[in-house]
Structures are given as C-alpha cells and as structure tokens.
Amino acid sequence: MKSPHMPSVHVIATGGTIAGTDGERGVSPSRSGHELIEAVPQLSDRFDATVTQVAQRPSTALSTSDIVAIAETVERAAATADGVVVLHGTDTMAETAYYLDLVVGSDTSVVLTGSQRTATDPSPDGPANLVGAFEAATHATVETGAYVFFNDRLHAARAVRKRHASNPGAYDSGHYGLVAERTPEGLWFYRRPESLSPRLPQSELTASVEVVTTSIGIGGDGLRDAVDRGVDGVVVDASGMGNVPPDVADAIETAIGEGVRVVVTSRCTDGATAPVYGGHGGAAALVEMGAVLGGDLDAHKARMALLAALSAPADIDIESLFDPPLFE
C-alpha cells in the first residue's frame, strides 16, 4: 500500500552484527531494532517506522522456526506498510532472503539488510545500509520478491551470495548482476525488480533436510548417517556440474531407495549442474538413480527450497523448483 505522505516501513529485527556491540567476550547483538532506527535521523525525517523484534541473535543461531516467524511477520506487515525491511546477520542472510522469496505472497516485497561492522565501530556501515534498504522497500518499482540491500547495491534473493567475510562490500549476484544501485539521485535499476523463484506455500518447516559435502577422499558415510537419522531430504554439494566420488554415488542410490529426496548442487560459484558425465558418480548417472540436479542454486539455498517443499501440506514437484528462472 503506497502512501502519498511519509512512507511507512515496518522493520523486523533479528539481531546480527548491525545490532552488535563489543564486549569482553567479543561482539554480541545487544541493540534493539528501535534503538537502531532511532540512531539514524535520516530515517525518522523521511519515514514512519514501526518495529517488531522477532529475535536477538547472531544469524548462525537462528532456527527454522525463526525464519517462519519472520515470513509470517512480513506477510502481516505488508498488508498495511508501504515497505518491509528485515534486519539480519550477514552470515545466513542469503538463506533467509531466499526462503522469503519462496514463500511470501506474490504481491509482497521485502528487503533484508545488516552490516559487517558493529554499531560501535569507528566507521559503521549499518546506517547507510538502513537508509538504502528503506528507500528500496518503499520504491514504487519494487513490488514483489525478496532482496538484499548492502553497500549501495540491491540484489535479488535467488542470486545473492555473501562472498567476503568482513568487507562492507560483502555481497554480489554473480552472473545475474545487480537489480539496482543507489546513486545520489536515487535507485538506478539495471533490470526489473521481480522474484526469480517458484512460489511455495508458507507452513511450519517440519521436514528434516541436511547438506552433505564432497571432496577428494571423502566417502558416503556422512550421507548414510543422515539417512540413518531419518532425514526426509539431503542436498549433496558436489563438484563441477554435479559429480561425486563413487562411494557417495552408492550412498545416494541407497538413500533414494529408502525414500529420501536427494538434490545435487555444485560448489562452483558460477554455472549450473548438468547431466553430462556418466560413469559411477557422474551427474548423468545420479539423475538415472532419481537424484534431482539443483541448477545454479548453492547448497544452502537448495536446502531451503527442499525444506519448504517437503514441509508443504501438499505434494510439490521437486524437480521444478530447480528450473532456470524466467525473466519477464
């Protein structure tokens, strides 16, 4: 709902470095969402902000229940606010953004932001990220989908990855490119802002899905252990276009035979999985076994898609979740 007056923004705060202060045992998120908004005068001068504090933790400590609560709060807030902004730790921000892109309504948009430096740092990046996120969330062109705004750049949730552990320019969108960039004259759009993800029903995340990595000399025991624990699905983070060691291939075949859904992704940052290589462990052989290739999604986002699909009240076509996105 776009207001002709001061735009309204609902902020969903979850903790993270943007709320962090230095202590004897390191940085911890101690500042509330209200405190963070009040510390940036440009926000109160231009926006009517309200806040819901969903969590107060590092993003690595968030649970699947937390991200469901974030999604539910986004949906409620979007009914009355001109924009919705989620304050989130950077380590898992891309995962939450992609989950929101999958489950929030088709007429809802949400912008996630945070910081690499604490609020008490001599040169904090949080205030500028907040201002930019508010501007993006209330922009008339940004009407659907989930985004990450960071370091003057707006990224689509499906594309964005954290590529630097500490630099304020932490995120990029790889071969997809930016959605927009903040300039002195406002947001400059490089392509239409839209969701690039399939739509899944929002529900409690009751399924169990794990990520198993592969490497030289690592066999399939990690996957077998996951199956023995009763998981519903496994994402195998493979090499190249989706190739795994022979013993991992054996474990995949066993898992599929026991009803576990297996998605194979690539640890490469660009490109996509493809059923090119045969032989025992090649992606073509894995597809013949019944594995699903994850396309260009990384393992963590593929897990979010599989988790949401397997938790849905109705059957979902798993393979279609990993089709290439179609731009309108």
Language-model segments: which ranges?
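Accessory alpha-helical/coil subdomains and C-terminal extensions
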Residues: 7, 12, 39-43, 158-232
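Short Gly/Thr/Asp-enriched flexible loops that form oxyanion-binding sites at enzyme active sites
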Residues: 86-108, 246-253
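Short, acidic/small-residue loops that bind anionic groups at enzyme active sites
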Residues: 97-127, 138, 257-266
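Internal gly/pro-rich beta-alpha loop/helix module
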Residues: 112-183
